[in-house]
Regions:
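Active-site acidic/histidine proton-transfer and metal-coordination neighborhood
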Residues: 16-17, 58-61, 104, 113-206, ...
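Hydrophobic faces of well-ordered beta-strands that scaffold small-molecule active sites
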Residues: 43-49, 72-74, 105-110, 135-137, ...
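Catalytic domains of carbohydrate-active enzymes, especially glycoside hydrolases
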Residues: 60-77
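Conserved, mostly hydrophobic/aromatic
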Residues: 64, 72, 98, 127, ...
Length: 312
C-alpha cells in the first residue's frame, strides 16, 4: 500500500478552511431520501476515502464535493472511517454523509475474502439496503500452495460464496487486479475463474497501474482486453521504476501522467466501451500537500475523459 503522507489532520483542516472546503454542521443529521442516479455518459470519478482518514467521515462528502469529485469509493476496512467492527451505525451514516451532499457512493472497498467472514454479510446487507451497486473484496494470495490449480479452485469457491451473498443484496462484485503474489495479478487466472460466472454479478475493478507493473506498457493493453467484457470499475494510479539495489527495481508511486502508464490508450479503450462506472483515484505517492495532489490527479482524469469520450 502507500506511504504515510506528510500533512497532519490540523494542517488538512486548515487548508480546507482556507479553500472554503469546510462548512458549518450545526444541528442533527437528518436522513435524506436516496434517488436513482441520473443516466451518465462519462465515468463517476471518485476518491478513495482512506486518503481522508484524518478528518471525520461526516466531512468527507463536503470535501470531495468542493474538490470537484463525483463520488466516493468508501473504505470499509480495518483502520478506515468505518472499520468492520463498527458497522452499525457508522456505515449507514457514512453513506448518508456523502450522498446527502449530492455525491454518489458507487462502490465500497472491503477486506472480505470469504462468505464465512463474520462481518461480510452485514457489510453487504447494509450496503445493499443503501443502494450501493458494487463492492470490492479483499485479496487472495497464492502463498506457498503446492498446487496452483488447487489454490485457484479454493479461491473460486470463495468468490462464488461472496458473490452469492452480494447478489442477494443486489450488489455486484468487482475484483481488483493487484500485483505480486495476489491471485489474478496477471488476470489470466481470474479470467479462468470467472469464465463460468454470470458477468452481471462478478467482474473486474481494473487497475492499469498494476497491470503495467505486472505486464509492462505493451502487455497492459492485453490485460485490459481480458478485463473489458467484465469491467465493473476502474482504479487509477501511476508509477515509475526506481532501483533500490543494482539487482532489483521497485515500483515507486507518482502523480498521474508522470509515470509509465499509457493513459491515452487506456482512456480511449474506456470510451470505446462506453464505460460509465466508477473510476477511483488512489494517491499513494509522497506529497506535502494532499489537497493539491487530489486536485492534480482529478484534473488529469477529467482531461483524459473529456478528450477520449469526445473523440469516441
Amino acid at each position: 500500500m502507500g506511504r504515510q503522507m506528510a500533512m497532519t489532520r490540523r494542517e488538512i483542516l486548515a487548508g480546507m478552511a482556507a479553500a472554503g472546503l469546510v462548512a458549518a454542521q450545526d444541528g442533527p443529521r437528518t436522513p435524506r431520501p436516496r434517488t436513482p442516479p441520473k443516466p451518465r455518459t462519462t465515468p463517476i470519478v471518485c476518491l478513495y476515502s482512506q486518503h481522508l482518514i484524518k478528518v471525520e467521515y461526516e466531512a468527507v462528502g463536503m470535501i470531495l464535493r468542493d474538490l470537484g469529485f463525483d463520488g466516493c469509493d468508501l473504505a470499509v476496512v480495518p483502520g478506515s472511517h468505518i472499520p468492520p467492527e463498527h458497522l452499525e451505525p457508522d456505515l449507514m451514516r457514512g453513506i448518508e454523509a456523502i450522498s446527502g451532499v449530492g455525491l454518489e457512493v458507487p462502490i465500497i472497498s472491503t477486506s472480505v475474502t470469504s462468505a464465512n467472514d463474520p462481518n461480510g454479510r452485514q457489510i453487504l446487507g447494509i450496503a445493499g439496503f443503501m443502494g450501493i451497486p458494487l463492492f470490492r473484496p479483499g485479496y487472495w494470495k497464492y502463498g506457498n500452495a503446492p498446487n496452483r490449480q488447487i489454490r485457484l479452485a479454493e479461491v473460486q469457491r470463495e468468490i462464488l460464496g461472496l458473490a452469492s451473498i452480494a447478489r442477494a443484496y443486489n450488489i455486484a462484485t468487482a475484483l481488483h487486479n493487484s500485483s505480486g503474489d495476489c491471485v489474478g495479478a496477471g488476470l489470466s487466472d481470474l479470467n479462468g475463474i470467472l469464465r463460468t460466472i454470470d458477468p452481471r454479478w462478478v467482474g473486474y475493478d481494473f487497475d492499469p497501474g498494476f497491470a503495467t507493473e505486472t505486464a509492462g506498457v505493451e502487455g497492459a493493453g492485453g490485460l485490459m482486453g481480458l478485463a473489458m467484457p467484465k469491467l465493473k470499475a476502474v482504479t487509477v494510479r501511476d508509477f515509475n521504476w526506481s532501483k533500490d539495489s543494482p539487482d532489483a527495481r521497485k515500483a515507486t508511486p507518482c502523480p498521474l501522467g508522470e509515470g509509465l502508464v499509457d493513459w491515452h490508450a487506456f482512456f480511449a479503450a474506456l470510451a470505446r466501451a462506453r464505460f460509465v462506472g466508477p473510476i477511483t483515484i488512489q494517491v499513494w505517492y509522497e506529497t506535502k500537500d494532499e489537497l493539491n495532489a487530489f486536485r492534480h490527479d482529478l484534473a488529469f482524469v477529467r482531461k483524459q475523459v473529456a478528450a477520449a469520450y469526445t473523440a469516441a
